[in-house]
């Protein structure tokens, strides 16, 4: 079986359906003997350019291991699902399980915001 990296963009009005979509794709891959090595829900983000007059969308990244038939079925599902605005599939040499740069950046930003919130507010000196 081969390794693939898939990113798909979901219409923002359909964001509530993303967990169900992910679970459906996971079940489809597992039923055919494949494996999901990494799954990252990047959430709602600003797009570089509008697609169908939409400026924000919900992004999802999956690194999977599957056969060609399973991949074709996934891509067929993306193509005919109106909620999926775009998708990209890249063949990888090996399974990727480390966090993506996007998630590393988000974690660092969250840690910084958490540190600022935990820091005590400076008290003015009483004279």
From Swiss-Prot:
Annotated GO MF terms: small ribosomal subunit rRNA binding; structural constituent of ribosome
UniProtKB keywords: Ribonucleoprotein, Ribosomal protein, RNA-binding, rRNA-binding
Ranges for region Disordered: 101-127
Biological processes annotated in GO: translation
Biased composition regions of type Low complexity, renumbered to the chain: 115-127
GO cellular component, one term: cytosolic small ribosomal subunit
InterPro entries for the chain: Ribosomal_bS6, Ribosomal_bS6_sf, Ribosomal_S6_plastid/chlpt, Transl_elong_EF1B/ribsomal_bS6
Source superkingdom: Bacteria
Family of the protein in this entry: Belongs to the bacterial ribosomal protein bS6 family.
Chain's role: Binds together with bS18 to 16S ribosomal RNA.
HAMAP family referenced in this protein's UniProt entry, alphabetically: Ribosomal_bS6 (MF_00360)
UniProt-recorded name of the protein: Small ribosomal subunit protein bS6
Organism: Thiobacillus denitrificans (strain ATCC 25259 / T1)
Gene that produces this protein: rpsF
């Amino acid at each position: 079986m081969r390794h693939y990296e898939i990113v798909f963009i979901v219409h923002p009005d359909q964001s509530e359906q993303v967990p169900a979509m992910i679970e459906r794709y996971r079940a489809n891959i597992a039923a055919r003997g494949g494996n999901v090595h990494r799954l990252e829900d990047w959430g709602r983000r600003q797009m570089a350019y509008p697609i169908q007059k939409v400026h924000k969308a919900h992004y999802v990244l999956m690194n999977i291991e599957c056969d060609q038939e399973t991949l074709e079925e996934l891509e067929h599902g993306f193509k005919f699902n109106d909620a999926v605005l775009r998708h990209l599939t890249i063949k990888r040499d090996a399974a990727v399980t480390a966090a993506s740069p996007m998630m590393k950046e988000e974690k660092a930003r969250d840690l910084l915001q958490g540190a600022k919130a935990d820091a005590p507010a400076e008290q003015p000196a009483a004279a």
